[in-house]
Design a protein with these regions (language model features):
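A Zn2+-metalloprotease active-site environment signal
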Residues: 1-275
């Protein structure tokens, strides 16, 4: 606040603009809400499931190309697709509107799996070849755990949710930058952006844990042993090595903490499903 010539207070125009920007951003975000039939959560999402599907289908070819292309190993590709479809067709995921397809990427070094909006799911050869209990034979329960986790991201609409959250963060960051603009302090914008980044990181960690929980549910519903998802966490831990990024600064929770949450989810869903 600043005093005007008459001794009263006036609000700087930049603050007024910032307040309007912030109010508009918040109204837009909270005005778009729907209940997720699988998770039961109220989500603030502007995209429709049809838009998510279209976005995923459009992005899939480019994503595969950036990751070294699709694998030429037809046998392993077939297994990935079969296990993925078994998880979907025998779980609550079947009752969602998404078009699920499972792809094996040729990258032998990167240990990763991810989902695009609408049901396009990828796993690298680098991760697939590590999903073994004896160093040689593929453990399909582990594969089901990885794919079930990614199906969880799709079902929970995490990509669409993330986009809405990023729009919210960007809108509020713009408002804060406008309100705190000071030509003599060029760091003000950097501070505002840092806050937005921290918000995004927090959401990502929560979404990963929710996908672990859903992955356990889908494994049980489709006849796989969810205890093997704990084994996947051990593989990820070993692959990361001793110099892992501290959990708070990582988008993904630490594998050790994920193992604890998965074990709790196993007991939760075995009770709910009567397994």
């Amino acid at each position: 606040m600043f005093r005007n010539e008459s001794g009263g207070f006036r609000i700087p125009p930049t603050v007024i603009i910032a307040l309007v920007m912030g109010a508009f951003t918040l109204c837009k975000y909270y005005g778009q809400s729907s209940v997720n039939d699988i998770t039961g959560e109220t989500q603030h999402i502007s995209m429709s499931p049809e838009q998510e599907i279209a976005m995923g289908l459009q992005s899939a070819p480019q994503m595969a190309q950036e990751m070294g292309g699709l694998s030429s190993n037809q046998q392993m590709t077939s297994i990935v697709k079969q296990v993925g479809q078994k998880v979907v067709q025998n779980s609550a995921a079947k009752n969602t509107p998404y078009q699920y397809d499972f792809h094996l990427l040729a990258d032998p070094q990167t240990i990763n799996a991810f989902a695009l909006p609408g049901g396009q799911i990828f796993i690298t050869e680098g991760l697939l070849t590590r999903l073994t209990t004896d160093g040689r034979t593929l453990n399909e329960d582990m594969l089901a755990g990885v794919l079930g986790h990614e199906v969880g991201h799709v079902v929970a609409r995490h990509s669409a949710e993330k986009m809405a959250q990023m729009e919210l963060a960007q809108g509020l960051t713009g408002a804060v930058t406008m309100a705190t603009y000071d030509p003599s302090n060029p760091n003000a914008g950097y501070i505002a952006q840092s806050v937005a980044n921290m918000i995004s990181m927090k959401y990502g960690r929560g979404q990963e844990l929710q996908s672990d929980n859903l992955g356990v549910r889908f494994m049980l519903e489709s006849g796989y042993q969810p205890e093997n998802l704990v084994g996947v966490m051990e593989i990820l831990k070993q692959a990361a090595g001793p110099n892992r990024t501290p959990e708070f600064q990582s988008t993904h929770p630490d594998p050790e903490n994920r193992k604890e949450a998965i074990q709790a989810a196993i007991q939760e869903w075995k009770g709910k499903l009567g397994k």
